[in-house]
Amino acid sequence: MESIEQQLTELRTTLRHHEYLYHVMDAPEIPDAEYDRLMRELRELETKHPELITPDSPTQRVGAAPLAAFSQIRHEVPMLSLDNVFDEESFLAFNKRVQDRLKSNEKVTWCCELKLDGLAVSILYENGVLVSAATRGDGTTGEDITSNVRTIRAIPLKLHGENIPARLEVRGEVFLPQAGFEKINEDARRTGGKVFANPRNAAAGSLRQLDPRITAKRPLTFFCYGVGVLEGGELPDTHLGRLLQFKKWGLPVSDRVTLCESAEEVLAFYHKVEEDRPTLGFDIDGVVIKVNSLEQQEQLGFVARAPRWAVAFKFPAQEQMTFVRDVEFQVGRTGAITPVARLEPVHVAGVLVSNATLHNADEIERLGLRIGDKVVIRRAGDVIPQVVNVVLSERPEDTREVVFPTYCPVCGSDVERVEGEAVARCTGGLICGAQRKESLKHFVSRRAMDVDGMGDKIIDQLVEKEYVHTPADLFKLTAGKLTGLERMGPKSAQNVVNALEKAKETTFARFLYALGIREVGEATAAGLAAYFGTLEALEAASIEELQKVPDVGIVVASHVHNFFAEESNRNVISELLAEGVHWPAPIVINAEEIDSPFAGKTVVLTGSLSQMSRDDAKARLVELGAKVAGSVSKKTDLVIAGEAAGSKLAKAQELGIEVIDEAEMLRLLGS
């Protein structure tokens, strides 16, 4: 007679097998009723023997108790976004850039996939068992949604098959099929619950439930599309090969993934998917096109927050017609005057749209737009609504001309338009309340100075009450002054003051980004900080010197140079430093002057370390003159292999690069 442990093992194995056939192979071999019977049998046995329940049991998908809030998970490998193209010409230009950058006659093949309209997630398996899952978040840090992801039946709690890596992080999309979406909304209308505008919102709402039991009731599903972390194992050297391997291990992969041998085949794939879009049963908003060869991907690399080897080819956005009620003018952080059409509300691609950007005066002229016109609205990239054209054949008799302002609608300063630029700008600078508000909101934002609790409404009140004129004024605020604001009690006020004090300790890159210099984003700010090292060196840099920084051209260099040439900007910076804003001095290391076995060497760490964290090891190696790289190449001098070292170790051995273990690293660090 079988033992209880044997019965449980057999039931779990059988259920996992049928989940694989149903969700991955799309070829169920037993009726739903039989699956339900097996699940009931397993559940009854586990109820009688709770000490034998395992985390990867199929019964554990039902969800645990509600969470008070989501904790954060930092992505070991950033979850990057993709650049978009919207027409054939743009895709062909991307194709040419790839061919030119590779600078070889080697053929490029493309792996083409559906661009699912859901939520990007990262799922980590250790020794084949699901241990954590996270949202994309800001690409660096996401929310811990492990409990909710465990309830999605398409996602295996345990991988099956051979040669499963010690650590494998898969990336993919959680989405809601249209039938499931309609059922959720039907139930919500019947019970008076929340009705979702589209399947993506419903998927997001379902996945971000603090109560996993609610998520478990939603028919979410999942497709894999990539890998993040890989340790203690190997994967094929093509993107398609990796997806096929995922499928062998039990991970669901779309059956529409296609290998294309040319740009013409990619375009044919795009048009076929566009034709089939209405019958897929789930929402997509384009196709994703990736260089299939991992070696070529590595050669192409990345720019800022996106890879050079992949692109999202978006479908034409959905369009609707409505009327323009009025045109208003908004003033942005850098003084840009943006006309905004106020519309008769209309649903476009599942979202109620009441405003649409008109971009600038040239666009209004191009459209021939008048207030009262009937217009076609498009959600560009399915995100930002814009006016596509005016329906001239249905123009009402009482339309009015759109008059672009010559004075700022907020502060009354002159509006000027520099020759060669499409954007008109308010010349008021920080005397303009709108610019001041937007500049301050940018300054305190999470990726800039990161002042916790300093929201938009607080900034609005501070500017309106004339408490704050420049960023430096923020650090002069007291709890007493803040308490006078709406919805700001003594405790909240003190929390903001404490957050401002904490924010004084920053990095040079964050500080530069926070200043809001035109066209200086996070990546450019980081590049400037790394290249010049000190504020003094950057302030003194010429336009020619600035252009030596990677990705800084004449336009950005001019903006940076002009910013520091402006006396009022230098005064604000001096005030900020006087208020105590500071960052660590740059560490300048001359490898030739360091007596260390690591000095001047390019070192790669792989696998997990037992005696110190990887960040601590990196910091110590840098102190000793090493350059720590993220991947193995012919330029690598040394690889330090910890536990469960994977493909990096294999590549090092293949290239004949010196490899040492953690014990030897510690010995050398101690010497």
Swiss-Prot record:
Catalytic activity: NAD(+) + (deoxyribonucleotide)n-3'-hydroxyl + 5'-phospho-(deoxyribonucleotide)m = (deoxyribonucleotide)n+m + AMP + beta-nicotinamide D-nucleotide
EC number: 6.5.1.2
Domain spans labelled BRCT: 593-671
Keyword DNA repair among UniProt keywords: yes
Lineage summary: Bacteria, Pseudomonadati, Pseudomonadota, Gammaproteobacteria, Enterobacterales
A GO cellular component annotation in the UniProt record: cytosol
UniProt: NAD(+) binding residues: 32-36, 81-82, 113, 136, 173, 290, 314
Ligase is among the record's keywords: yes
SMART domains per record: BRCT, HhH1, LIGANc
Full protein name: DNA ligase
Organism per entry: Escherichia coli O157:H7
Family (UniProt): Belongs to the NAD-dependent DNA ligase family. LigA subfamily.
InterPro entries in alphabetical order: BRCT_dom, BRCT_dom_sf, DisA/LigA_HHH, DNA_ligase, DNA_ligase_AS, DNA_ligase_CS, DNAligase_adenylation, DNAligase_N
Binding of Zn(2+), residues: 408, 411, 426, 432
One GO biological process term: DNA repair
